[in-house]
UniProtKB/Swiss-Prot annotation:
The gene is iolE. Its EC number is 4.2.1.44. SUPFAM superfamilies: Xylose isomerase-like (SSF51658). One of its GO terms (biological process) is inositol catabolic process. Pathway: Polyol metabolism; myo-inositol degradation into acetyl-CoA; acetyl-CoA from myo-inositol: step 2/7. InterPro entries: IolE, IolE/MocC, IolE/XylAMocC-like, Xyl_isomerase-like_sf, Xyl_isomerase-like_TIM-brl. Signal peptide: none annotated. The lineage of its organism: Bacteria, Bacillati, Bacillota, Clostridia, Eubacteriales. Belongs to the IolE/MocC family. This is Inosose dehydratase. Keywords: Cobalt, Lyase, Manganese.
Length: 298
């Protein structure tokens, strides 16, 4: 299961050091993170804040470990700022990733987002775009998609807790309003389950537009606590709402099966942000790799 000729397996640095809460994993260096990724059996990673900004320095460090850059997160503000501001930042981001050999660019709209707010309840305080904002978002993403296409790349939209594109209805609306040849979807298991969505339904519906996959699991008891105690997204992360595949409540077997049946081609990355002082990053990377091998033979 899963075509090893077409699928690449990676892991994100957020398990070692958290860009949104830099105190989590502040003791973990870039070199330690990428060395442990390679040692655990992964072939790629996404870019974190501690990664060298110089392309040649980063390439050398990754080449030593036989790792590639799969992508990097880009925050758009298409609903709250002039398009030109986002475009300028996007082009610089695109060009860096292009030099690193990446084929996809992860984009998430952060206008009105509460994901980075420490005190806003993640399950209650979400913003809902109005029609004008939806149009700004869709039009802007189509433009960014063309800019990516200019370099032979694709943008993949990251639905995310606490943002204007979180629920099934919102994902449907975004997909219907954007050009299917310019705007693709990032499929994130953890964010869908966290939001109460059906990841299998999303995967089946958009199999042809999903060009990037994040695997994260959910600790159901912690998620229940987050809801009950009205915690923010970041507080939930500190509590351990997310973990690696095989360590939580999500059944990944049907997900792997559907990806395989639809001839998925691209990166599948473990992305499980939690406190590295509690969940040792190398240990959990090994745990994830073992689980994926057991379920897919990969």
């Amino acid at each position: 299961m899963l075509n090893t000729e077409k699928v690449k397996l990676g892991i994100c640095p957020i398990g070692w050091t958290n860009d949104d809460m830099p105190d989590l994993g502040k003791e973990n260096t870039f070199e330690q993170a990428v060395s442990e990724m390679a040692l655990a059996g992964f072939k790629g990673t996404e870019v974190g804040n501690k990664y060298p900004k110089d392309v040649n320095v980063l390439k050398k460090a990754l080449d030593l470990r036989n790792l590639q850059i799969a992508s990097a997160w880009f925050s758009s503000f298409l609903t709250t700022k002039p398009y030109e501001e986002t475009e300028k930042e996007f082009i610089a981001h695109r060009d860096f990733l292009h030099e690193m050999g990446a084929k996809v660019i992860v984009v998430s709209e952060q206008g009105h987002s509460i994901q980075g707010e420490m005190d806003t309840p993640i399950c209650e305080g979400k913003y809902y775009f109005n029609e004008e904002e939806w149009k700004l978002l869709a039009d802007g993403l189509n433009k960014l998609g063309r800019l990516a296409e200019d370099k032979g790349m694709k943008i993949v939209y990251h639905h995310h807790m606490g943002t204007g594109v979180q629920t099934t209805d919102e994902i449907d609306k975004l997909m219907s309003m954007t050009d299917e040849s310019l705007v693709y979807l990032l499929f994130d298991t953890g964010h869908l389950v966290y939001s109460g969505e059906n990841p299998i339904a999303i995967l089946n519906k958009y199999a042809n537009r999903i060009k990037h996959v994040h695997l994260k699991d959910i600790r159901a008891d912690v998620l229940e606590k987050v809801k009950k105690e009205k915690m923010s997204f970041l507080m939930g992360v500190r509590e351990g709402s997310f973990t690696v595949p095989g360590d939580g409540c999500i059944d990944f077997e049907p997900i792997f099966k559907i990806l395989d049946e639809n001839n998925y081609e691209g990166w599948i990355l473990v992305e499980a942000e939690q406190d590295p002082a509690i969940a040792n990053p190398f240990e959990y990377a090994m745990k994830a790799r073992k689980y994926i091998k057991e379920k897919t033979g990969f």
